[in-house]
Amino acid sequence: MIIKLKKGEVVFRNPELLAVDTKMVNLDRVLTNLFMQIYSVGAPVSLAVKTEHKIESLINYVKNLEDKGLVHGAKANQDAVEDWLRSNLLELVNRGNVVKEKVSSLKPMHLMSFRVQNRKYCRDYNTADQLYMMLKANPGVLGELKEYLRKGWDLSTNSMIGSEELDVDTTGILYLTKELKDKKGLNTDTKDAKPFLEKQTELFNDDIRRLLEYKDKLPRTVFIDYLKILCGFHLALYTMKLVYLLPKMVDAGSKDVVDDWSLVVDMTDNLDSKVAPYACQDAEHIANLYRSYVRSTFVINLCQNRLKASGANASVENALAYAKNELKKDDSYYEFALQAVRNGLEDDDARKEFDEILQYFDRNDYFDKYVHLLEKSNLGTTQYKYLGQFLDAVTMKNTTSMLFADSRSKRHPRRGAMGSKLLETLVQILLLQKDENGS
């Protein structure tokens, strides 16, 4: 039985734990939204162009550039322009489907590439929020990355810098976006939150700092590809570590628990290698923790809400301590919240299911009833599916950049596995050694 809660009645996502609203994401679109946040210093951005960008409209942009004398031969070679846009500059959804194909955005090759995007096809479900939050923890790394990404564009005058050399595709992106406008809004609460797993955030920023050592040595396409791989890799590590550690933190009533998380990775291409069973067991163990992670998140959310209602400090650390030491499960606050959910159900059948789900709990144990109800609701049950989809996406499963792999056969379930491009990226950054000054 699944209790159907109304949209917005209860929220699972907690930016103080993980900013991501875990769903299937595309890492290129995540980078597009991340670049927008880096450009706007975390503020929301309103784009001036409200109409949908299409292949035809972008070809017209190029024609207008020819009218201004900025490019030559576009009108006489429209097929070549379209091929260039499709293959080199654009992210497309349903690529190749004549009916369903739509423009998502420009490829994330430059800081300003976000200006051409159709937002409904460029959703990242707050994944860029998490990455920006982590980057913001090290202003030096964030500033250096921004400086690299904005190359060829003057942020103070909002114009191109002709003296800075760029590759053809990135230059094309700048010409397509140079006349477009945007408006920065105010910062949101999400951007003010700090990463929950500080040590994992430090590792992420250290890897980005190492990658930036190659900024003048690698072609821009290769650098951006490495950046995408590292972002996906660290999103996966951060999420899996949170899934593993959060239930332990709730049990301990503190954020200070032993971080003994690990992942066995099969480095072979053999599905039946000797290490494959151990890699499968580790991946299965992570999946088996989804339920306790979802429950722990609900526990923290409810305790934070209670602390806010009483005017107390509602940080995650205080919520953990409250759940362990001060929580009263018969608190009338949870009784009223539970009753409000019941009253909001659509019909008598739903209320009957509500009562059946909670019939074996102690009568006055309103807190555990509420948590269990949320687990059994549409909000809770979808989290298990979406969390797996999110991890499959950020680990780039079954690609050359993968951290996870599986096959269609039940004999070969999901396992940790390292793709050649991920290995290449990690080797490149690990070749660098710190000097005597620690830089």
Describe each region flagged by the PLM.
Residues Q37, V41-P44, Y61-H72, S87, ...:
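Surface-exposed polar/charged interaction patches
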Residues V30-Q37, K54-L65, A80-W84, N88-L92, ...:
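Charge-rich, solvent-exposed alpha-helical interaction surfaces
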Residues R342-V427:
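Long, low-complexity, charged/polar intrinsically disordered regions in eukaryotic proteins
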Residues T425-S439:
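C-terminal structured domain segments
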Residues I224-Q359:
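Long, internal scaffold/assembly segments composed of regular secondary structure
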Residues M1-R123:
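Charged, amphipathic alpha-helical stretches
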Residues T22-R29, S46-E56, H72, A76-A80, ...:
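Alpha-helix boundary/N-cap detector
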Residues S87-D256:
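Long, mid-chain structured domain cores
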